[in-house]
Design a protein with these regions (language model features):
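Flavin-dependent oxidoreductase catalytic core characteristic
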Residues: 1-36, 51, 61, 69, ...
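Glycine-rich beta->alpha junctions and the first turn(s) of the following alpha-helix
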Residues: 12-23, 200-242
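Long, well-ordered alpha-helical segments
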Residues: 27-32, 85, 112-119, 155-161, ...
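Short secondary-structure junction/hinge motifs that connect adjacent elements
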Residues: 37-59
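Internal helix-loop-helix
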Residues: 58-128, 168-175
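A short, Trp-centered hydrophobic/proline-enriched beta-strand micro-motif
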Residues: 127-135
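Hydrophobic, small-residue-rich alpha-helical packing segments that form membrane-like cores
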Residues: 140-143, 158
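A short core secondary-structure module
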Residues: 161-201
């Protein structure tokens, strides 16, 4: 019987390709060398430096599984290994990277127009544009069926009203992908620019955990979203749950 290896109980190491090991090792070197020395201070101060997103971008971590728009196009396994190394230091790094990649870039890539993809994905890939995703609400958590945020059709676009809470990256984000229901009850994705009138994305302060994560609200008071900023490829629960 083979000796049990406590560090690798599922024998994952034996199942990885050489490329996957190289990606994992590069992520580990960066996380341990560059991020680990920062986290105690950041956790004490409830601080996250957005410049780290540009470092993620240089390493190809943002949108890493997307096959185009200059993204790395790596496997889901490889991306999971990167995420594990970020999480090994602190969940704030994995959260910031994961929200940008999986909750903002991926829906834009899947459901967005060509113009939306060209406008947002290259900048988000490089960490020059930070995104957040608004689903969770104060009264219903992440239960999309109970969503109260509304998108009312007006000339040239929509007006969004509602509040999203516990939103990773919102205090730093230049763009928010907000999921809202229209007047027929259909769920759609709306891209809101930070400087939009009626939009406020303040920080949630005094957290007892995940303190180095930049977490906040998305408050919307009849925020105008032009037609061209609505994701055209989805109008159902499939969008936020993809």
């Amino acid at each position: 019987m083979a000796e049990f290896v406590w560090e690798d109980p599922l024998m994952l190491e034996d199942q990885l390709s050489e490329e996957e090991r190289q990606i994992r090792d590069a992520a580990r070197d960066f996380a341990q060398g560059e991020l680990a020395p920062l986290i105690v201070d950041w956790n004490r101060r409830e601080f996250f430096d957005p410049e780290i997103m540009k470092e993620f971008g240089k390493l190809g971590f943002l949108g890493a599984t997307l096959p185009d728009y200059g993204c790395a196009g790596i496997s889901n396994v490889s991306y999971g290994l990167i995420a594990r190394e970020m999480e090994r230091v602190d969940t704030c790094f994995r959260s910031a990277m994961g929200v940008q990649t999986g909750l903002v870039m991926a829906p834009i890539h899947m459901y967005g127009s060509d113009e939306q993809k060209e406008r947002y994905l290259p900048g988000m890939r490089d960490g020059k544009i930070i995104g957040c995703m608004g689903l969770t609400e104060p009264s219903h958590g992440s239960d999309a069926a109970g969503m109260q945020t509304r998108a009312k059709k007006v000339d040239g676009g929509y007006k969004l009203t509602g509040t999203k809470q516990w939103i990773t990256n919102s205090p730093l984000a230049q763009v928010a992908l907000v999921w809202a229901k229209n007047e027929e009850g259909e769920v759609g994705g709306y891209l809101l620019e930070r400087d939009a009138e009626g939009l406020d994305m303040p920080t949630i302060e005094g957290k007892m955990a995940v303190r180095a994560s930049s977490t906040g609200f998305i408050h919307m008071d009849e925020v105008f979203c032009p037609d061209e900023n609505k994701l055209p490829g989805v109008k159902s629960m499939r969008g936020p749950l993809s």
